[in-house]
Amino acid sequence: MRFFFYGTLLDHDVAAVVLGRRLPPNAYVPASLPGHARRRAKGASYPVVIPDPRGEVPGVIVGGLSARDVEHLTVYEGPGYRIVPLRVRSHGKLETVTVFEPVVSRLQPSQDPWDLALWQRRHKRAFVQRLRRAFSGRPVYSRQ
């Protein structure tokens, strides 16, 4: 299965903890989600995407995900997101892939744009520590 990642899963360490394994660098194919904007979720450090006819959200397509991977991703994303097919642009072509789209009744966007590099500087360390604890009931990826 192929997914478009646009938020914290763009960080390879986060993806490794969630999936229980590190994906090879070539698993991440640059792509963008036209007709949307990426905002920080209200009261949170992670993003949501919202419709915006002038917007285009950068991200990656990750393919070759197993049913178990999708299960882990679904647990990670939680009830605030639903899995939907959306059209993304990659290498100049539009293609349909799977995206975790926010459920508006559960996650509200702030006015603040979300930036991966800023999130990594400000929030990543504590976020990954919490994530490792949350996923400690099953084997997680370790660099050791």
Task: Tell me the role of every PLM-derived stretch.
Residues 1-144:
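Glycine-aromatic micro-motifs
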